[in-house]
From Swiss-Prot:
<dbReference type="GO" id="GO:0019013">
    <property type="term" value="C:viral nucleocapsid"/>
</dbReference>
<keyword id="KW-0946">Virion</keyword>
<keyword id="KW-1035">Host cytoplasm</keyword>
<keyword id="KW-1139">Helical capsid protein</keyword>
<dbReference type="GO" id="GO:0030430">
    <property type="term" value="C:host cell cytoplasm"/>
</dbReference>
<dbReference type="GO" id="GO:0019029">
    <property type="term" value="C:helical viral capsid"/>
</dbReference>
<protein>
    <recommendedName>
        <fullName>Nucleoprotein</fullName>
    </recommendedName>
</protein>
<dbReference type="InterPro" id="IPR023331">
    <property type="entry name" value="Rhabdovirus_ncapsid_C"/>
</dbReference>
<dbReference type="InterPro" id="IPR035961">
    <property type="entry name" value="Rhabdovirus_nucleoprotein-like"/>
</dbReference>
<dbReference type="InterPro" id="IPR000448">
    <property type="entry name" value="Rhabdo_ncapsid"/>
</dbReference>
<dbReference type="GO" id="GO:1990904">
    <property type="term" value="C:ribonucleoprotein complex"/>
</dbReference>
<comment type="similarity">
    <text>Belongs to the ephemerovirus nucleocapsid protein family.</text>
</comment>
<keyword id="KW-0597">Phosphoprotein</keyword>
<comment type="function">
    <text>Encapsidates the genome, protecting it from nucleases. If expressed without protein P it binds non-specifically RNA and therefore can bind it's own mRNA. Interaction with protein P abolishes any non-specific RNA binding, and prevents phosphorylation. The soluble N-P complex encapsidates specifically the genomic RNA, with protein N protecting the genome like a pearl necklace. The encapsidated genomic RNA is termed the nucleocapsid (NC) and serves as template for viral transcription and replication. Protein N binds protein P in the NC through a different interaction, and can be phosphorylated.</text>
</comment>
<comment type="subunit">
    <text>Homomultimerizes to form the nucleocapsid. Binds to viral genomic RNA.</text>
</comment>
<keyword id="KW-0687">Ribonucleoprotein</keyword>
<keyword id="KW-0167">Capsid protein</keyword>
């Protein structure tokens, strides 16, 4: 820009304190393929001793996190499965075919030789209690990740019911925010939870698979932008490629480019990638709603207009370029609501000629009344082809037809019980 006051060129810059996201592949490239590190405190304590300390702490509400981490590590060390094939992620050898691995094969483990912390022990506990005690302790992770009181209450009801199924006189787990709220800020406890979940995600029939009740929130943590894509595919019935064809806003497209950065194993269910945050592989997720606010908002606007409860309750994280993103979402939701993609799955024997006509392309009937009476716009596209719709909108200076706007306003009026600061609340407020 040229300033007429001082007759000089100035460079306009926007202040920002945003930290660039870190892709999981960068961790392994920069670390020469080394595994993430797990540090385990209280190295002098054996399993029977630390089990008694943990059970005593649970009974009295005096749990020591260092004891918990040591206990969960020792239990996980004894949980093994044989691999049917090589397990490799980002070039890291987690295990080879026919190898027995345990929960900690994902880490370089460092056992710390720190001073032993004492506590009140309970002697009425043995290895048979490990199945529910592990569940109870890992459930603190999930409780700590939930900010919703009602959600935590429901989790506790289910958790305590499960625990009582293993041991009738087991202590009740309570909603102690000070405890579970602080535990989830401890990086080693989060790595413990991630290790259990990554292992049980592969070995779903393991005796300890039920502990995922407490650890499942570790998988795809801070990946709401990426997960929104998968959810949108479910709601719309479109493939990811077909969804991308409907993106008419540059900011949304830029977010997709971020998400689709190659080499990050987002399509590998057994990769380190879903656990990159809790395992310390990334300092800032490139897949979060904060890193990709435009695609996240766009997809959940579409989902909400198509009556998805999950999208309705999705957080409203950004208002950047919201008008354009909203108009793009209006078009997509209108088309998906009014133009079905149906297939005749079964045919009577006498109707087989229909299949041949379809293959020959000789049955292309179209609805002649689709365009309506909107003379200013001309005929709206009769198909659900994104290119046709974009050309139509472009030719009309991207002013939405009344038919589209009226449909979306009607859908917005139907939204009820939307929580504050959510996509649903925003749409309900614009009518």
């Amino acid at each position: 820009m040229y300033c007429t006051l001082n007759k000089k060129e100035i460079k306009a810059v926007k202040p920002t304190d945003a930290i660039p996201p870190q892709y999981p592949k960068e961790f392994f490239i920069n670390g020469n393929g080394k595994k993430p590190t797990l540090r385990v405190p209280q190295g002098k304590l054996d399993l029977p001793t630390v089990r008694e300390l943990v059970f005593g702490g649970l009974e009295r509400g005096e749990l020591v996190l260092s004891h918990v981490i040591r206990y969960l590590y020792l239990v996980g060390e004894r949980i093994t499965e044989k691999l049917e094939g090589d397990w490799i992620s980002f070039g890291v050898n987690i295990g080879r075919r026919n190898q027995e691995i345990n929960v900690w094969n994902f880490y370089e483990v460092i056992i710390e030789d720190d001073q032993t912390i004492d506590g009140r022990r309970a002697n009425n506990v043995d290895e048979n209690d490990d199945v529910w005690l592990t569940l109870a302790l890992l459930a603190y992770y999930r409780l700590g990740r939930s900010a919703n009181q009602n959600h935590r209450n429901n989790l506790l009801i289910k958790l305590n019911a499960q625990i009582k199924g293993y041991r009738k006189d087991a202590p009740n787990i309570i909603d102690d925010v000070a405890v579970h709220g602080s535990w989830v800020t401890n990086s080693e406890f989060c790595k413990i939870a991630a290790g259990f979940d990554m292992f049980m995600n592969r070995f779903k029939n393991n005796k300890y698979a039920h502990v995922r009740f407490g650890t499942v929130a570790s998988r795809y943590k801070d990946a709401a932008g990426l997960m929104a894509l998968g959810h949108a595919c479910d709601v719309t019935g479109l493939t990811i490629g077909e969804i991308l064809d409907w993106i008419f806003v540059s900011n949304v497209g830029e977010d997709v480019v971020k998400i689709m950065e190659e080499g990050n194993e987002i399509d590998d269910p057994y990769s380190y990638m879903p656990y990159m945050m809790d395992m310390g592989i990334s300092n800032k997720s490139p897949y979060s709603s904060i890193s990709c606010p435009h695609i996240y908002t766009f997809l959940h606007l579409v989902g909400t207009l198509l009556t998805s409860e999950r999208s309705k309750h999705a957080r409203m994280v950004s208002e950047h370029n919201l008008q354009n993103i909203k108009m793009n979402a209006f078009v997509v939701s209108y088309v998906k609501s009014n133009k079905a993609a149906l297939t005749k799955a079964f045919l009577k024997s006498e109707d087989r000629d229909y299949e041949k006509r379809q293959e020959d392309g000789s049955n292309d009937d179209e609805d002649e009344d689709e365009s309506g009476d909107d003379d200013d716009f001309g005929a709206m596209p009769k198909s659900s082809d994104p290119m046709e719709w974009f050309i139509f909108l472009e030719s009309n200076h991207f002013i939405l037809p009344e038919k589209v706007t009226e449909f979306c306003i009607r859908e917005c009026k139907k939204i009820q019980n939307a929580r504050p600061n959510t996509i649903g609340k925003y749409l309900a407020s614009i009518v």
